[in-house]
Regions:
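Serine-hydrolase catalytic machinery in alpha/beta-hydrolase-like enzymes
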Residues: 1-91, 109, 181-187
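The conserved beta1-alpha1 loop
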Residues: 22-26, 121, 149
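Short alpha-helix in the alpha/beta-hydrolase fold that links the catalytic acid
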Residues: 36, 134, 143, 157-165
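Primarily recognizes the serine-hydrolase "nucleophile elbow" in alpha/beta-hydrolase
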Residues: 75-143
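Short beta-strand/loop motif that positions the catalytic acidic residue
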Residues: 141-142, 147-149, 153
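Acidic catalytic loop of the alpha/beta-hydrolase fold
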Residues: 151-155, 182-183
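Catalytic histidine neighborhood in serine/cysteine hydrolases
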Residues: 167-184
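Catalytic active-site module of serine/aspartate enzymes centered on a nucleophile-bearing elbow/loop
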Residues: 180, 188-215
Length: 215
């Protein structure tokens, strides 16, 4: 199946791609949200092929996200098509908030030939409900994980997140955005400056697991 038939968008890397990243959106905004497009373009400019997509509920303009099995199935379909489109030998998956959580679900399900997971703002719990943790699957993840978390994230601060991270047997890297919120926005800093920081962190992490590449 091709990317276009799935409503996915591919961002070609500058130069030969060193890796592929399939990036899923958060619960409230689709792949055309400025965060998603800026991050995708930033990775591509640094030598990583990127594919974004909309989950079924977003394509159908429904407000309530689909159940996890539906989201996971859609994610897997896009990963399969993205691998054919890219040709990169290393495949990473990830996403913003809910999309990142779904990526960890696929990592826990042992998706074939997965190199790692990149999460921008893991939604550990709903805001104001720290007892409703979304962590049961984390201990089953067997691939490296990078979590980029705002220091003031209402869905889970880095301090709250650390006990959950310790249940993951694979290597986990936690990058904290000082004074950042769940959207990784920081008062007093330009949005593009913060995004450049987190993209640089993520690309360096991908390079470390992929070897050198062109950008």
């Amino acid at each position: 199946m091709e990317l276009t038939s799935l409503g996915a968008v591919g961002y070609r890397a500058d130069g030969k791609p060193g890796a592929l990243l399939v990036l899923a959106h958060g619960a409230g905004a689709g792949q055309q949200h400025p965060f998603m497009t800026a991050v995708a373009k930033g990775f591509a400019a640094r030598g990583v092929d990127v594919v974004t997509f909309d989950f079924p509920y977003m394509r159908e303009r429904r407000k309530i996200p689909d159940k996890a099995p539906v989201l996971e199935k859609a994610f897997v379909e896009v990963v399969t098509a993205a691998r054919q489109w890219s040709g990169a030998t290393r495949c990473f998956i990830g996403g913003k908030s809910m999309g990142g959580r779904m990526a960890t679900h696929l990592g826990a399900a042992h998706l074939d030939d997965l190199s790692g997971i990149v999460v921008f703002g893991y939604p550990l719990h709903p805001p104001g409900k720290p007892d409703q943790l979304r962590v049961a699957h984390l201990g089953s993840i067997t691939v490296p994980v990078l979590i980029i978390q705002g220091e003031r994230d209402a869905f889970g601060t880095p301090r709250e997140l650390k006990p959950a991270i310790e249940t993951i047997t694979a290597k986990v890297t936690l990058h904290i955005v000082a004074k950042g919120d769940h959207s990784l926005s920081v008062t007093g800093r330009r949005r593009d400056e913060v995004l450049d920081e987190v993209i640089d962190v993520a690309v360096a992490w991908i390079r470390a697991g992929s070897g050198p590449f062109s950008k």
